[in-house]
Amino acid sequence: MGVDLKPLIDTVAKTIKLESLRDKVIAIDAYNALYQFLATIRGYTGEPLMDSHGRVTSHLSGLFYRSVNLLSLGIKLVYVFDGKPPSLKYRELDARRRVKEEAMMMYEQALQEGRLDDARKYAQATSILKDYMVNDAKTLLSLMGIPYVQAPAEGEATAAYMSKIGIAYATASQDYDSLLFGSARLIRNLTISGKRKLPNRNVYVDVEPEIIELENLLNSLSITIEELVDIAILIGTDYNPDGFKGIGAKKALHLIKKYKRLENIDVESIQEGLNHIDYNSIRRIFLEPTVAKVNVVEFKDIDKEGIIRFLCEERDFSKERVNNALQRLEQAMKISRSGLDRWF
């Protein structure tokens, strides 16, 4: 879910062209991307793509074709996978599980009643990322020569660390949490493209990549990263999902700019609420996160035969379509001036 910082970020978020990321390393929140693919790449009645053995392949389709498109533009990708979540996140994860279970019941009922539009809508909320699916994604990345990092805890924290120390230019996620973890830059809409349907409306909008620079954000708001984290706690994070009643992003900003720290806010209801959350531990999760100390990422040669064997022979992908994508990628790499010919 992440923190709803959008009202504070809209003024500094800049739309970019993917071509501007050529030769730059982008650390992608793997779970965030895979869940996007699982939610959006589905059949006519909302069912996920599967192979002949019943194994879900929607995430592999999205991972392969979107990565090919990005690599063809000379963008260097690193996927960062979640490890064990902080214990404070268990409540949020349990709530997400219940939402998925309810969505599945509504999906099945809509199917039975022939309400296909509703069925497709509910289906998007049922996505589950199982261990074999994560392993399949890692296998595909290895065959594509794309490095991945296994984080010990939150993947976004390790991705942000890579951005902070300069191994990656930016992190990529739909959530804003990377900024709370200290990422120098966050890119949204990197792994999605085209048009997006607005919730509960028959209206589609263009989806364009955007970049948020942490320094610009903090300067524009005249706050520190520590104060940004306190603002997030007031709004509600994955570690205190309820937040504080009646407190949105703009009111939280006003309170922190006035009082500087949560403990100093002279509002009785907030002080009472602070007694029921471990806000210092939440601060530490963001400001002193457990991360993989990545020093270098290694981009390897692509294994075209291995990709065809894995996707086409083992997971029932179209050999013609996979071959076409690989040929397009190879041609783009040949004419690239970025020195990425080592991928082949």
Model-derived features: positions:
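Mobile, glycine-enriched helix-loop/loop "lid" segments at the mouths of ligand-binding/catalytic clefts
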Residues: 187-208
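Active-site-adjacent pocket scaffolds in enzyme catalytic domains
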Residues: 181-184, 248
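Glycine-enriched alpha-helix->loop->beta-strand junction motifs that scaffold or abut catalytic
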Residues: 167-169
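Non-catalytic nucleic-acid-binding/docking modules located in mid-to-C-terminal regions
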Residues: 3, 12, 16-22, 37, ...
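Hydrophobic/aromatic ligand-binding patch that stacks against planar heteroaromatic rings
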Residues: 69, 161-162, 178, 231, ...
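Noncatalytic, basic helical substrate-engagement surface that gates or grips nucleic-acid strands
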Residues: 3-12, 20-164, 184-186, 192-193
